[in-house]
């Protein structure tokens, strides 16, 4: 980000830069490997992988926009360089975009092989995202709901492609939920340390382990591991927190 002025406010950014910051796009690769891992574990055909990845990317991006929209008052004094308090985007604008992205993500699920089941899990994910964004400052409930959101990504992806939620997918989702809960809880206690981006990128390593254990082959596992480096590199351009 640009140099800060004496009052802590960053220079005005372009809309594109503001939206990239709001979306925390550097973390999107972790969503893609979540979807890939869910497909591999569920034994699903990759024919619908792209739509699932796009849908869940929109869920994630919408959630990130809403995170800033709900936090606008807090950020005005705690993080004045965030796009809303910095004047790069209005709170109303960010709310509208956030909810629109969730709606589009949910709508894309009708294109999946099992749209009804996918839509139900998608609504559960949307509800969890909105609840997290509204109440995540609570140090007890926030990490739990954040972990639940990640677990639901697995369930949306697997159910949309296969129509079921195999116990292996539920197990992997539970492990990922525990990982993200721990990451979020520690980050809330310790603040945004230099190691937090590594833990976020580490989601891809967990996915790579799941893919390997499920017999997904070296290519899929390598993609997930390579994404660890990609995520860290992107976080140097667009911060992931």
What are these regions (language model features)?
Residues 1-81, 89-94, 118-124, 133, ...:
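Topogenic membrane-insertion module of multi-pass membrane proteins
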Residues 12-19, 59, 75-87, 101-111, ...:
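Short juxtamembrane and helix-loop transition motifs at transmembrane-helix boundaries
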Residues 35-42, 105-113, 129-133, 153-161, ...:
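Structural signal for membrane-spanning alpha-helices in multi-pass inner-membrane proteins
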Residues 42-46, 113-117, 159-166, 213-219:
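Membrane interfacial helix motifs at helix-loop boundaries and amphipathic/re-entrant anchors
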Residues 54-55, 72-129, 147, 153, ...:
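Multi-pass membrane catalytic core of lipid/isoprenoid biosynthesis enzymes
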Residues 57-62, 125-133, 150-155, 175-185, ...:
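Alpha-helical transmembrane segments and their membrane-interface exit regions
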Residues 69-75, 138-147, 163-171, 189-195, ...:
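A cytosolic-side transmembrane-helix exit/cap motif
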Residues 191-241:
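Extended hydrophobic alpha-helices typical of membrane-associated regions
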């Amino acid at each position: 980000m640009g140099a800060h002025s004496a009052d802590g406010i960053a220079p005005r950014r372009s809309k594109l830069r503001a939206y990239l910051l709001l979306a925390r796009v550097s973390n999107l690769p972790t969503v893609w490997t979540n979807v890939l891992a869910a497909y591999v574990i569920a034994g699903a055909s990759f024919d619908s992988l792209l739509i699932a990845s796009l849908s869940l990317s929109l869920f994630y991006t919408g959630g990130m926009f809403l995170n800033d929209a709900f936090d606008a008052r807090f950020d005005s004094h705690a993080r004045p360089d965030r796009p809303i308090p910095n004047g790069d985007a209005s709170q109303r604008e960010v709310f509208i975009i956030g909810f629109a992205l969730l709606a589009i993500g949910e709508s894309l699920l009708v294109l999946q092989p099992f749209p009804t089941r996918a839509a139900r899990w998608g609504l559960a994910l949307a509800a969890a995202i909105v609840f997290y964004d509204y109440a995540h400052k609570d140090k007890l409930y926030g990490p739990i709901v954040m972990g639940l959101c990640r677990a639901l990504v697995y369930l949306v992806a697997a159910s949309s492609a296969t129509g079921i939620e195999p116990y292996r997918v539920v197990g992997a989702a539970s492990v990922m939920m525990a990982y993200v809960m721990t990451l979020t809880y520690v980050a809330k206690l310790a603040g945004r340390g230099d190691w937090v981006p590594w833990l976020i990128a580490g989601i891809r390593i967990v996915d790579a382990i799941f893919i390997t254990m499920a017999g997904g082959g070296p290519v899929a596992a390598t993609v997930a591991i390579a994404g660890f480096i990609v995520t860290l590199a992107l976080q140097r351009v667009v911060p992931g927190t």
